[in-house]
Amino acid sequence: MEYLYNTIKLVLIGGENSGKTKFFECLVKKKQDLDFSNYISSNSAQYLCKDIIYKNIFYRLDVWDTVGQEKYDHIAKIFYKDADIVFIFFIYNSKNSFKRANTIFQLAQINSKPDVIFALIGNKYDEDKNCLKEEDNILNEEEILEFVEKNNLIFGHSSIKENYSDGINEIFMKVMNEYTKKKKKINI
Protein backbone atom coordinates (compact mmCIF):
# COMPACT_ATOMS: atom_id res chain seq x y z
CA MET A 1 0.00 0.00 0.00
CA GLU A 2 1.36 3.40 -0.98
CA TYR A 3 0.81 6.37 1.29
CA LEU A 4 0.56 9.93 0.09
CA TYR A 5 2.07 12.42 2.46
CA ASN A 6 1.23 16.02 2.99
CA THR A 7 4.57 17.58 3.80
CA ILE A 8 4.72 20.29 6.46
CA LYS A 9 7.81 22.40 7.02
CA LEU A 10 8.06 23.26 10.74
CA VAL A 11 10.76 25.69 11.85
CA LEU A 12 11.83 26.25 15.46
CA ILE A 13 13.24 29.73 16.11
CA GLY A 14 14.10 31.69 19.22
CA GLY A 15 16.98 33.23 21.08
CA GLU A 16 19.97 31.41 22.43
CA ASN A 17 19.21 28.97 25.26
CA SER A 18 15.43 29.22 24.76
CA GLY A 19 15.01 25.44 24.69
CA LYS A 20 14.48 24.87 20.95
CA THR A 21 16.83 21.91 20.72
CA LYS A 22 15.38 20.06 23.73
CA PHE A 23 11.87 20.71 22.40
CA PHE A 24 13.05 19.39 19.02
CA GLU A 25 14.41 16.24 20.64
CA CYS A 26 11.15 15.67 22.52
CA LEU A 27 8.93 16.33 19.51
CA VAL A 28 10.86 14.46 16.86
CA LYS A 29 13.01 11.96 18.69
CA LYS A 30 10.63 11.36 21.62
CA LYS A 31 13.58 11.36 24.00
CA GLN A 32 12.51 10.51 27.51
CA ASP A 33 15.86 10.84 29.25
CA LEU A 34 17.24 14.23 28.39
CA ASP A 35 20.44 15.52 29.96
CA PHE A 36 19.96 19.01 31.40
CA SER A 37 23.21 19.17 33.33
CA ASN A 38 25.34 20.44 30.47
CA TYR A 39 24.07 23.21 28.19
CA ILE A 40 25.81 23.41 24.83
CA SER A 41 24.79 26.16 22.45
CA SER A 42 23.82 24.92 18.98
CA ASN A 43 26.14 26.21 16.29
CA SER A 44 24.29 24.77 13.31
CA ALA A 45 20.75 23.96 12.29
CA GLN A 46 19.42 20.44 12.74
CA TYR A 47 16.93 18.70 10.49
CA LEU A 48 14.82 15.61 10.99
CA CYS A 49 11.61 14.37 9.49
CA LYS A 50 8.83 12.64 11.35
CA ASP A 51 5.79 10.88 9.95
CA ILE A 52 2.55 11.48 11.83
CA ILE A 53 -1.13 10.76 11.42
CA TYR A 54 -3.50 13.57 12.32
CA LYS A 55 -7.26 13.16 11.84
CA ASN A 56 -6.62 10.06 9.70
CA ILE A 57 -4.32 11.89 7.29
CA PHE A 58 -0.62 11.13 6.89
CA TYR A 59 1.78 14.02 7.25
CA ARG A 60 5.52 14.21 6.94
CA LEU A 61 6.96 16.86 9.24
CA ASP A 62 10.20 18.40 8.04
CA VAL A 63 11.42 19.90 11.30
CA TRP A 64 14.22 22.47 11.36
CA ASP A 65 15.87 23.45 14.65
CA THR A 66 17.64 26.75 13.95
CA VAL A 67 20.53 28.49 15.67
CA GLY A 68 19.47 31.19 18.15
CA GLN A 69 22.42 33.58 18.22
CA GLU A 70 21.79 36.99 16.63
CA LYS A 71 24.84 36.68 14.40
CA TYR A 72 22.99 33.94 12.46
CA ASP A 73 19.77 35.94 11.83
CA HIS A 74 20.69 36.51 8.18
CA ILE A 75 20.98 32.74 7.67
CA ALA A 76 17.76 31.97 9.56
CA LYS A 77 15.74 33.79 6.88
CA ILE A 78 16.40 30.86 4.58
CA PHE A 79 14.67 28.45 6.95
CA TYR A 80 11.38 30.24 7.35
CA LYS A 81 11.08 31.27 3.72
CA ASP A 82 8.95 28.22 2.82
CA ALA A 83 7.79 27.29 6.31
CA ASP A 84 4.21 26.19 6.91
CA ILE A 85 4.51 26.47 10.70
CA VAL A 86 6.96 28.49 12.80
CA PHE A 87 7.41 27.95 16.54
CA ILE A 88 8.92 31.00 18.26
CA PHE A 89 10.51 30.31 21.65
CA PHE A 90 11.17 32.46 24.69
CA ILE A 91 11.89 31.59 28.30
CA TYR A 92 9.84 32.91 31.18
CA ASN A 93 12.65 34.03 33.43
CA SER A 94 14.11 36.50 30.94
CA LYS A 95 12.51 39.64 29.54
CA ASN A 96 15.39 39.80 27.05
CA SER A 97 14.38 36.38 25.75
CA PHE A 98 10.86 37.66 25.11
CA LYS A 99 12.20 40.79 23.38
CA ARG A 100 14.40 38.57 21.22
CA ALA A 101 11.38 36.40 20.33
CA ASN A 102 9.53 39.56 19.26
CA THR A 103 12.44 40.60 17.01
CA ILE A 104 12.71 37.13 15.51
CA PHE A 105 8.96 37.02 14.91
CA GLN A 106 9.15 40.28 12.96
CA LEU A 107 11.99 38.91 10.81
CA ALA A 108 10.13 35.67 10.20
CA GLN A 109 6.91 37.48 9.35
CA ILE A 110 8.67 39.61 6.73
CA ASN A 111 10.49 36.65 5.19
CA SER A 112 7.80 33.95 5.24
CA LYS A 113 4.83 33.19 3.04
CA PRO A 114 1.51 34.87 3.92
CA ASP A 115 -0.32 31.76 5.17
CA VAL A 116 2.33 30.59 7.63
CA ILE A 117 1.09 29.65 11.11
CA PHE A 118 3.03 31.17 14.00
CA ALA A 119 3.03 29.76 17.52
CA LEU A 120 4.66 31.49 20.47
CA ILE A 121 6.00 29.04 23.02
CA GLY A 122 6.80 30.10 26.56
CA ASN A 123 9.41 27.52 27.39
CA LYS A 124 10.92 26.40 30.68
CA TYR A 125 7.53 26.93 32.32
CA ASP A 126 8.64 24.70 35.19
CA GLU A 127 11.23 27.24 36.31
CA ASP A 128 10.27 30.03 38.69
CA LYS A 129 9.11 32.95 36.53
CA ASN A 130 10.24 35.37 39.22
CA CYS A 131 13.67 33.86 39.78
CA LEU A 132 15.49 36.99 38.63
CA LYS A 133 15.66 39.65 41.32
CA GLU A 134 15.90 42.67 39.03
CA GLU A 135 12.45 44.07 38.24
CA ASP A 136 13.43 44.82 34.64
CA ASN A 137 13.95 41.14 33.91
CA ILE A 138 10.61 39.82 35.14
CA LEU A 139 8.10 39.12 32.41
CA ASN A 140 4.57 40.37 32.69
CA GLU A 141 1.95 37.78 31.64
CA GLU A 142 -0.32 40.55 30.32
CA GLU A 143 2.46 41.75 28.02
CA ILE A 144 2.82 38.25 26.59
CA LEU A 145 -0.92 37.80 26.03
CA GLU A 146 -1.19 41.25 24.44
CA PHE A 147 1.60 40.32 22.00
CA VAL A 148 -0.13 37.01 21.19
CA GLU A 149 -3.49 38.67 20.55
CA LYS A 150 -2.07 41.58 18.56
CA ASN A 151 -0.20 39.21 16.22
CA ASN A 152 -2.85 36.46 16.07
CA LEU A 153 -0.48 33.81 17.39
CA ILE A 154 -1.15 30.40 18.82
CA PHE A 155 0.28 30.38 22.34
CA GLY A 156 1.36 27.60 24.62
CA HIS A 157 3.55 26.77 27.59
CA SER A 158 6.20 24.12 27.51
CA SER A 159 8.16 22.40 30.20
CA ILE A 160 10.66 19.90 28.95
CA LYS A 161 11.69 18.80 32.45
CA GLU A 162 8.24 18.41 34.02
CA ASN A 163 5.46 16.59 32.12
CA TYR A 164 7.01 17.73 28.88
CA SER A 165 4.91 15.53 26.63
CA ASP A 166 1.65 17.17 27.74
CA GLY A 167 2.81 20.70 26.92
CA ILE A 168 4.43 19.76 23.64
CA ASN A 169 1.50 17.65 22.50
CA GLU A 170 -1.04 20.33 23.44
CA ILE A 171 0.83 23.01 21.47
CA PHE A 172 1.32 20.70 18.54
CA MET A 173 -2.39 19.73 18.44
CA LYS A 174 -3.44 23.41 18.47
CA VAL A 175 -1.12 24.12 15.55
CA MET A 176 -2.19 21.06 13.55
CA ASN A 177 -5.84 21.98 14.07
CA GLU A 178 -5.17 25.47 12.69
CA TYR A 179 -3.10 24.04 9.83
CA THR A 180 -5.85 21.64 8.72
CA LYS A 181 -8.47 24.43 8.94
CA LYS A 182 -6.36 26.66 6.68
CA LYS A 183 -5.77 23.84 4.20
CA LYS A 184 -9.51 23.08 4.02
CA LYS A 185 -10.26 26.73 3.19
CA ILE A 186 -7.65 26.70 0.43
CA ASN A 187 -8.95 23.44 -1.08
CA ILE A 188 -12.64 24.44 -1.13
Which role does the model predict for each range below?
Residues 1-188:
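TRAFAC-class small GTPase G-domain
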